[in-house]
């Protein structure tokens, strides 16, 4: 072999050279060391051939992986190179075990061989006087070396050896798995045992005896695979190997060991033929002629002679055939080597071993025992390589490669909301600048053309996206709150990324290049307007993740679960194109296989305008006037753009539409410019040259340059100078073809960070349209500075009208895109148009296809349907197969989905119209797909040609059938292929029973494999009669080989022992009972109970004929089955014994999925139920299909949601299942007699997809992909709503200025009481009024009242204080409106959300605000009041208490109450009687308030109860009100509380309550009213009976009646109490100026100053309903800045949500914090979809604790995935 040192100089004729390639794979540690070494050497420029070999081998491996079905491909982790693949040690235990070992062996041996020869100091390993010897997989590497006369030859030969190693491993695994499936658990089992001290004859004789005695089927028989001096190796399926050794007296006691051969069977002609070898090497990419010359002979391990092949392909085929079928006879190899050494008369043999040379021990001994001893020098090259230190690396230059752009999308000014609308704008030459819109800021207040107003803009112009607030939050799983706080740049990056991915036909993990772990996201962004100005006005939860730049790409990664790199880049104006370059570099470096890149810019901050104006960047006269004589600066613009990119070879392999390719891209810096913002022509020209040189493209071949072209005199002139210098020079070599230039900024302004991506998308559209749009920047005349650059000699042109874009060189258009940065950076990209795509026009002959449309909402679903219909109306020539391929294999699918089968585009349009009209009927599919049951048909469904279309058009299906047919023949059975292929159907006789039964079995096994490739695998299986055999295979009970063996043997035994056609079978449409009643004692047997009214009977033909006559006479339908025997009848008896004996040789495994047994009428899970006797019984006994399904249904294995797939040639079982399980929603066939297979499948696949099953649609279309084209269909129809935080005021102008403090205004009303201190607003209009006041809890009177009601040693405003406030405001407003005294006042629906807790130490004001609205036009007239906290002078947007006052007639109330007085008085009398009898507790005053101290410490003024009687939850009290005067009150709390707080005494003092562990507090009442005023010193009686609220655990309510002299004069209606753990008391009631204590059950939650202590959310409205007239619904109080509130849920939803108050509170909180509608919180709504992310979870967990009193972890929203699961959790845990 020629090496850096010529072999002629180094070969020693006194040596005989032997190179040995071992079959032993090194240890994992050594493999890692070898791989690391090869990786390091490949990066060294001194090992170029190694690098090329590794690259070629990687590509070869990728080519093979692309051929794999998805279920196999998913097992392989993404990899950058073949070295990464070899590191995947875990693959060795699965279907890729043999492949990975073979690939690793070849890789290490060949890589080491190449690197060894690339070192100039090493002697060549081979020579003309040498021989190659190898064992096992080492033969593949040796074969490559054999024909590599030059080292570069080994690149191609070696990479093909890698391919063959991979393919052979897969073939061996497939063949071996048909013989015996691998164990699901436990260590791998050996397929080979080696015996020493036994001769080959002894072993062969013993094997023949044992194979026969154990009745092993031919394919599974044990055989001799290798013979060497002193040892014999036998091979076979592991279970049979063990059985044979245990059963053999000779072998059991011999000396033997199992070999580490775990990946299947080789060296046997039982399992393989020459066709297997031919198929394995068929994929090789080697010339058929002899372009390679044999360099060194390779010895066969079968006979020791050199392989006689004359071409590498022939040699590889011979090697593969030997590995698969040949017995290793190493003694012949040793003999040949001995003879060759002797012939050369050399004294020395040099053995270079690539791997452990243990196998050469016999050769060494033979040559040394010769009469003239020969010295043998052995060197392990692999071991020596590891021992040699790595040289200092000489780095290799980066590798250039074409990058394909396969998708794009944009949102650009001028209404460019799509790629097409952007092109329309360009084509028309529009200039879309306009005045700054109001949604950004008020241009009139923020614009000053004179520049006198600080911080104001000097220009009112810009180019803007139409309504950037629009966004589909639900699609991207964002809550409305998160969407509102998220920068619209980030939101539109998500939107355009999705649209670009759609155009690219992206489906996660569809191909190796779309593996989500290998997808990266890159976006350029140079400003933070929305975060700084809009969201910064009111900083919320999502201020950081919604506005920080890193979250723009990060959010895309997170949403799509992309595991690749994520970068946000800021290079000022060049951010987006520089980002695209970084993304390309990532692809070139192999760090990702697909990237999404783009740029974003949305302008909302006036500061940017002001700063750029002051920096002299901006024009004040309109848009960018690029190249115009009057160019005076640029015009700012919005812009969002995204592109999807892959390496070109991946895009071609993925059948993508390629928009253009990137040949080269680079960035440099204008470091030598006069200032940082000034351009530099030399730097720009240098960059262009570098880009062109890297790509190897002549600059004169470029026909279009998209310039940066901002419209500044200096910038445009400098760029034009650099462009003409390189692309249109004036030197001796000039352009012969025109160069056009353009600049998109003249249309849509300067998008800054998005400028580059806008320019790139423009050029991509030019490629698509093959046209150059007109330039619109020159408004007056060409700038005089630029005229010299546009000399005719340069042949450079500006298009002023639409111009065809013609190719310049080799029919290829090259374009350059420039994007420069104000910070000095220059980025340039070279583009080439996409390669021509070749489509096979006649490759897809399917008649019927599935078309699907889906969305995440009904609105979007309808929009998608309408858009697709419009597309088809505009494009009637659309190919149906392309449409099906695009909508299924190249689309992501969502939960609102429609799928249907169609045979024409007209049919599709008809279906679309139907579904548009009925889209409301579509229900979203469940998040968890339904279980799938497979039913396997029996013999009665047979017909010739079944499965023929699948067999002819799906290679994987054909392979399965072919291999199964091979197994049939290996077992000695006839071939099934003539039946499948339907060869000679017209002349052929009816197939023999064995053929029909084998065909059905093999077909159903192959169909199961095919369904698995489509992503559909059974969770349970059932088979009818013959169908039970493929069912057992599908469940993993039987291997494919054993299944075929049993079916064939059963057929042979029946043929041997039973008379053909002597018996018959008949299906009867009747139950077993009805048949019995009809036939009486007439002879027949029940064979199958298929359905309640479907039974099969059998017997002698005459008996069946007689039975038929009787049954039909009774009106029963009968059908004679066309079967050769009466299965499941006594006719089977003669064959049963022999069949059972045969079946006993088969290995039965535990089911991997449950097996529904029609024999047992039960479900089988274990390994002991199915055995040889079971197979005997299943042959003879009835098939009870009904009983089996009932048993499965009873234990929950199947239910009405289970989807049934009938895996058979014709739907027979579908009707049986429907009759047994009428509620089943979906049953689909696979094939149907007299119908094209694809038509049947189309209908079934459409149904399965509609049910929510995840289908591998790419596998459906894979056989036809070469003839299919990805359509550019309309993008997703968004369900958009506006999410926008409007910038308010002019604070960006005034920031930094000293703000004068406002002077407190005088009160606007004279109203002042102890509870209301300052009226801020009082407006009366007709019969309505609004009122705003503030009160100070530290006011002496109010503080005394609150401090007299102490809880947890804190003063807490009692509900009676809120009552006085309501009485006061209601009375005052009524008088103001009517100038008359107020009538009766009823305070209804008092709801206190948080307790008002007084400060403990601080003497500062503790303010709260009161807002009221009175409306006397309603009936009844009302005043609505809300209470708000005030912190640092700012009123909270959320109220903490509310009430509705209703005005009524006190006399009417008294009249109503008189009817109740006798009932209340009778209950009081009853309590008094019980007290006298000792049955009720009598509580004197001190005792009563001592019990109150369990929770509340009342001041003396409140202690009005003089005595009380209590029995469980019923009580009465005698009350005397205080005579102490204190303050100005309307209804003093010292009066209201004593007559009402008897209810609190019952709840917190009764023996019936657990007051040790719990306390009870009231969040409010339904009504409080007094028909007569309470008076100082007055004597009253109170009565109450508290009862639990039905359906609301932990809640009680009751009516407190207030009596005076036996007359009811007041009522507290439905005062409600709720139970809480006592441990939460410190959490709920702590002063705002004291940190809350830590507590085991209630972790501390920080409290805002002046905020009231949290009290649980009030009981729902249901708890407050009473017999009183209904109150008006609460009306929100006015607020200066109204907070966004959730709309109330519909009535039905409201009722469902209010069943439990805790759950109601939780849902209210979730809705409020997420800005969702309550109606959206349905039980099946997923929190991830609603946008409840980790941040929102933290907020909600805190709110749950502080406001609901329930402590949950923030992870609860991941553990409970849906609203329904959370409600269940709360109910079970806290209620």
Curated annotation (Swiss-Prot):
Alphabetical keyword list: Multifunctional enzyme, Phosphopantetheine, Phosphoprotein, Transferase
Ranges for domain Starter acyltransferase (SAT): 35-262
Record keyword Phosphoprotein present: yes
Positions of region (C-terminal hotdog fold): 1480-1626
Chain spans, region Product template (PT) domain: 1313-1631
Domain spans labelled Malonyl-CoA:ACP transacylase (MAT): 934-1244
Low complexity composition-biased segments: 1688-1697
Catalytic activity: holo-[ACP] + 8 malonyl-CoA + 8 H(+) = atrochrysone carboxyl-[ACP] + 8 CO2 + 8 CoA + 2 H2O
EC class name: transferase
Domain Carrier as annotated: residue spans: 1697-1774
Gene3D superfamilies: 3.30.70.3290, 3.40.47.10, ACP-like (1.10.1200.10), Malonyl-Coenzyme A Acyl Carrier Protein, domain 2 (3.40.366.10), Polyketide synthase dehydratase (3.10.129.110)
Disulfide-linked positions: none
Residue stretches making up the PKS/mFAS DH domain: 1317-1626
GO biological process entries: fatty acid biosynthetic process; secondary metabolite biosynthetic process
Segments of this protein annotated with the region N-terminal hotdog fold: 1317-1451
Residue intervals of the Ketosynthase family 3 (KS3) domain: 400-833
Transferase is among the record's keywords: yes
Highest taxon of source: Eukaryota
O-(pantetheine 4'-phosphoryl)serine modifications at: 1734
Region (Disordered): 1671-1697
SUPFAM superfamilies, sorted: ACP-like, FabD/lysophospholipase-like, Probable ACP-binding domain of malonyl-CoA ACP transacylase, Thiolase-like
GO molecular function, one term: phosphopantetheine binding
Cited function: Non-reducing polyketide synthase; part of the gene cluster that mediates the biosynthesis of physcion, a natural anthraquinone fungicide that can prevent plant fungal infections. The pathway begins with the polyketide synthase AcPKS that condenses 8 malonyl-CoA units to synthesize atrochrysone thioester which is released from the synthase by the atrochrysone carboxyl ACP thioesterase AcTE that breaks the thioester bond and leads to free atrochrysone carboxylic acid. Spontaneous decarboxylation of atrochrysone carboxylic acid leads to the formation of atrochrysone.
Official protein name in the record: Atrochrysone carboxylic acid synthase
Organism: Aspergillus chevalieri
Name of the coding gene: AcPKS
């Amino acid at each position: 072999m020629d090496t850096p040192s010529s072999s002629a100089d180094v070969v020693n004729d006194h040596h005989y050279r032997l190179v040995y390639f071992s079959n032993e794979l090194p240890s994992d540690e050594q493999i890692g060391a070898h791989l690391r070494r090869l990786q390091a050497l490949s990066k060294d420029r001194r090992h170029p051939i190694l690098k090329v070999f590794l690259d070629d081998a990687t590509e070869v491996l990728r080519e093979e992986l692309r051929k794999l079905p998805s279920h196999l491909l998913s097992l392989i982790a993404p990899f950058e190179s073949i070295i990464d693949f070899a590191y995947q040690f875990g693959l060795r235990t699965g279907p890729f075990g043999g492949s990975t070992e073979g690939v690793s062996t070849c890789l290490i041996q060949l890589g080491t061989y190449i690197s060894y020869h690339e070192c100039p100091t090493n002697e060549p390993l081979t020579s003309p006087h040498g021989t190659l010897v190898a064992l096992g997989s080492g033969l593949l590497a040796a074969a490559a070396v054999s024909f590599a006369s030059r080292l570069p030859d080994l690149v191609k030969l070696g990479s093909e050896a890698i391919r063959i190693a991979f393919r052979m491993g897969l073939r061996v695994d497939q063949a071996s798995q048909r013989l015996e499936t691998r164990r699901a658990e436990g260590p791998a089992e050996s397929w080979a045992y080696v015996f020493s001290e036994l001769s080959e004859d002894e072993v062969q004789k013993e094997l023949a005896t044992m194979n026969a005695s154990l009745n092993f089927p031919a394919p599974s028989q044990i055989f001799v695979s290798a013979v060497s001096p002193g040892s014999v190796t036998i091979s076979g399926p592991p279970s049979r190997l063990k059985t044979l050794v245990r059963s053999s007296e000779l072998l059991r006691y011999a000396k033997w060991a199992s070999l580490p051969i775990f990946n299947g069977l080789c060296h046997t002609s039982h399992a393989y033929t020459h066709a297997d070898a031919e198929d394995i090497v068929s994929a090789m990419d080697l010339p058929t002629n002899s372009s390679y010359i044999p360099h060194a002979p390779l010895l066969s391990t079968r006979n020791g002679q050199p392989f006689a092949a004359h071409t590498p392909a022939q040699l590889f085929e011979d090697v593969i055939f030997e590995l698969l079928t040949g017995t290793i006879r190493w003694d012949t190899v040793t003999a040949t080597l001995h003879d060759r050494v002797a012939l050369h008369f050399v004294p020395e043999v040099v053995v270079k071993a690539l791997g452990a040379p243990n196998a050469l021990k016999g050769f060494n001994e033979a040559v040394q025992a010769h009469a003239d001893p020969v010295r043998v020098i052995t060197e392990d090259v692999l071991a020596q390589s590891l021992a040699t230190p790595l040289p200092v690396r000489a780095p290799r230059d980066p590798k250039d490669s074409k990058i394909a752009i396969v998708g794009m999308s944009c949102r650009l000014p001028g209404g460019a909301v799509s790629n097409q609308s952007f092109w329309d704008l360009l084509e028309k030459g529009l200039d879309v600048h306009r005045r700054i819109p109001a949604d950004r800021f008020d241009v009139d207040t923020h614009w000053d053309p004179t520049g006198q107003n600080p911080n104001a803009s000097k220009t009112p112009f810009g180019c803007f996206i139409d309504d950037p607030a629009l966004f589909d939050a639900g699609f991207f799983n964002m809550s409305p709150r998160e969407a509102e706080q998220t920068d619209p740049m980030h939101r539109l990056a998500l939107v355009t990324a999705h649209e670009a991915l759609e155009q690219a036909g992206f489906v996660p993990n569809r191909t190796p290049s779309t593996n989500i772990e290998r997808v990266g996201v890159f976006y350029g962004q140079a400003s933070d307007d929305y975060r700084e100005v809009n969201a910064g006005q009111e900083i919320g939860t999502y201020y950081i993740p919604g506005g920080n730049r890193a979250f723009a790409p990060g959010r895309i990664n997170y949403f799509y679960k992309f595991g690749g790199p994520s970068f946000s880049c800021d290079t000022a104006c060049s951010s987006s194109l520089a980002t695209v370059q970084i993304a390309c570099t990532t692809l070139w470096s192999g760090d990702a296989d697909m990237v999404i890149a783009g740029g974003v810019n949305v302008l909302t901050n006036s500061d940017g305008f002001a700063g750029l104006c002051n920096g002299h960047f901006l024009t004040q006269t309109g848009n960018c006037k690029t190249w115009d004589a009057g160019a005076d600066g640029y015009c700012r613009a919005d812009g969002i753009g995204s592109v999807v990119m892959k390496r070109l070879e991946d895009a071609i392999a993925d059948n993508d539409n390629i928009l253009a390719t990137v040949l080269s891209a680079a960035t440099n810096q204008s470091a030598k410019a006069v200032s940082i913002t000034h351009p530099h022509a030399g730097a720009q020209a240098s960059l262009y040259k570098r880009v062109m040189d890297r790509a190897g493209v002549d600059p004169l071949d470029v026909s279009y340059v998209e310039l940066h072209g901002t419209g500044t005199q200096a910038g445009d002139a400098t760029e034009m100078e650099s462009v003409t210098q390189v692309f249109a020079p004036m030197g001796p070599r000039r352009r012969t073809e025109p160069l056009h230039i353009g600049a998109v900024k003249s249309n849509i302004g300067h998008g800054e960070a998005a400028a580059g991506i806008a320019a790139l998308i423009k050029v991509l559209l030019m490629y698509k349209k093959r046209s150059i749009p007109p330039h619109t920047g020159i408004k007056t005349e060409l700038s005089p500075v630029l005229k010299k650059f546009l000399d005719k000699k340069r042949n450079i042109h500006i298009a002023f009208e639409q111009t065809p874009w013609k190719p310049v060189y080799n029919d290829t258009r090259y374009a350059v895109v420039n994007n420069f940065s104000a910070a000095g950076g220059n980025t340039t990209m070279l583009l080439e148009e996409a390669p021509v795509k070749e489509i096979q026009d006649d490759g897809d002959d399917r008649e019927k296809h599935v078309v699907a449309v889906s969305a995440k909402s009904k609105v979007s679903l309808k929009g998608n349907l309408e858009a697709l219909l419009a597309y088809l109306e505009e494009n009637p020539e659309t190919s149906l197969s392309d449409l099906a391929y695009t909508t299924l294999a190249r689309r992501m699918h969502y939960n609102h989905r429609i799928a249907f089968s169609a045979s024409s585009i007209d049919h599709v349009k008809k279906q679309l119209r139907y579904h548009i009209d009925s889209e409301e009927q579509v229900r979203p599919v469940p998040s968890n797909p339904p279980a799938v049951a497979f039913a396997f048909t029996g013999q009665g469904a047979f017909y010739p040609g079944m499965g023929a279309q699948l067999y002819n058009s799906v290679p994987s299906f054909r392979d399965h059938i072919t291999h199964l047919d091979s197994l049939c023949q290996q077992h000695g059975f006839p071939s099934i292929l003539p039946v499948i292929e339907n060869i000679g159907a017209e002349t052929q006789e009816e197939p023999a029973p064995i053929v029909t039964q084998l065909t059905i079995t093999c077909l159903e096994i192959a169909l199961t494999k095919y369904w698995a490739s489509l992503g559909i695998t059974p969770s349970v299986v059932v088979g009818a009669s013959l169908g039970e055999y493929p069912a057992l295979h599908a469940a993993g009970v039987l291997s494919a080989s054993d299944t075929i063996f049993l079916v064939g043997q059963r057929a042979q035994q029946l043929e041997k022992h039973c008379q053909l056609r002597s018996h018959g079978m008949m299906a009867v449409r009747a139950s077993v009972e009805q048949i019995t009643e009809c036939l009486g004692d007439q002879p027949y047997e029940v064979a199958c109970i298929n359905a309640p009214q479907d039974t099969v009977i059998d017997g002698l033909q005459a008996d069946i004929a007689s039975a038929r006559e009787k049954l039909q006479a009774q009106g029963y339908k009968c059908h004679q089955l066309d079967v050769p025997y009466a299965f499941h009848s006594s006719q089977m008896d003669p064959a049963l014994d022999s069949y059972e004996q045969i079946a006993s040789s088969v290995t039965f495994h535990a089911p991997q999925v449950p097996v529904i047994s029609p024999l047992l009428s039960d479900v089988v899970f274990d390994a002991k139920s199915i055995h040889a006797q079971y197979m005997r019984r299943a042959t003879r006994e009835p098939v009870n299909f009904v009983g089996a399904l009932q048993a499965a249904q009873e234990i929950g294995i199947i239910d009405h949601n289970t989807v049934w797939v009938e895996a058979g040639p014709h739907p027979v079982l579908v009707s049986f299942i429907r009759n047994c399980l009428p509620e089943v929603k979906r049953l689909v066939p696979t094939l149907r007699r007299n119908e094209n297979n694809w038509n049947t499948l189309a209908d079934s696949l459409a149904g399965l997809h509609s049910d929510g099953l995840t289908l591998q649609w790419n596998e459906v279309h894979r056989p036809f992909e070469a003839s299919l084209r990805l359509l550019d269909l309309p993008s997703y129809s968004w369900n958009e709503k506006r999410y926008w935080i409007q910038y308010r005021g002019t604070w960006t102008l005034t920031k930094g200025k000293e703000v004068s403090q406002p002077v407190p205004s005088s009160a606007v009303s004279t109203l002042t009481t102890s509870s209301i201190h300052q009226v801020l607003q009082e407006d009366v209009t007709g019969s309505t009024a609004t009122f705003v006041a503030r009160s100070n809890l530290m006011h002496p009177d109010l503080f005394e009242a609150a401090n007299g009601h102490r809880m947890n040693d804190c003063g807490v405003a009692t509900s009676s204080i809120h009552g006085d406030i309501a009485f006061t405001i209601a009375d005052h407003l009524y008088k103001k409106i009517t100038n008359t005294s107020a009538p009766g006042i009823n305070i209804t629906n008092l709801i206190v959300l948080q307790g008002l807790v007084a400060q403990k130490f601080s003497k500062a004001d503790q303010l709260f605000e009161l807002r009221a609205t009175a409306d006397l036009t309603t009936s009844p007239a009302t005043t609505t009041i809300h209470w708000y906290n005030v912190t640092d002078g700012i009123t909270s947007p959320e109220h903490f208490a509310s009430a509705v006052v209703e005005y009524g007639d006190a006399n009417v109330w008294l009249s109503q109450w008189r009817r109740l007085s006798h009932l209340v008085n009778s209950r009081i009398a009853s309590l008094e009687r019980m007290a006298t009898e000792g049955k009720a507790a009598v509580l004197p005053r001190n005792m009563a308030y001592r019990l109150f101290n369990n929770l509340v410490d009342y001041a003396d003024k409140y202690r009005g109860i003089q005595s009380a009687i209590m029995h469980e939850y019923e009580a009465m009290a005698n009350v005397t009100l205080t005579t102490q005067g204190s303050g100005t009150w309307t209804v003093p709390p010292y009066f209201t509380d004593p007559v009402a707080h008897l209810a609190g005494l019952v709840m917190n003092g009764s023996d019936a309550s657990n007051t040790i562990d719990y306390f009870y507090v009231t969040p409010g009442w339904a009504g409080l009213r007094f028909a007569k005023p309470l008076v100082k010193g007055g004597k009253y009686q109170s009565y109450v009976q508290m009862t639990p609220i039905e359906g609301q655990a932990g809640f009680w309510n009751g009516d407190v009646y207030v009596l005076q002299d036996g007359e009811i004069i007041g009522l507290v209606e439905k005062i409600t109490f709720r139970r809480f753990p006592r441990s939460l008391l410190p959490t709920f009631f702590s002063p705002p100026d004291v940190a809350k204590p830590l507590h085991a059950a209630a972790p501390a939650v920080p409290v805002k100053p002046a905020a009231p202590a949290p009290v649980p959310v009030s009981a729902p409205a249901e708890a407050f309903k009473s017999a009183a007239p209904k109150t008006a619904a609460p009306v929100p109080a006015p607020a200066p800045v109204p907070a966004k509130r959730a709309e109330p849920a519909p009535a039905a939803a409201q009722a469902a949500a209010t069943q439990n108050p805790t759950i109601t509170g939780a849902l209210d909180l979730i809705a409020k914090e997420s800005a969702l509608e309550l109606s959206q919180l349905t039980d099946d709504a997923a929190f991830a979809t609603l946008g409840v992310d980790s941040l929102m979870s933290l907020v909600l967990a805190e709110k749950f604790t502080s406001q609901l009193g329930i402590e949950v972890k923030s992870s609860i929203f991941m553990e409970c995935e849906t609203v329904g699961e959370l409600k269940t959790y709360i109910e079970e845990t806290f209620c």
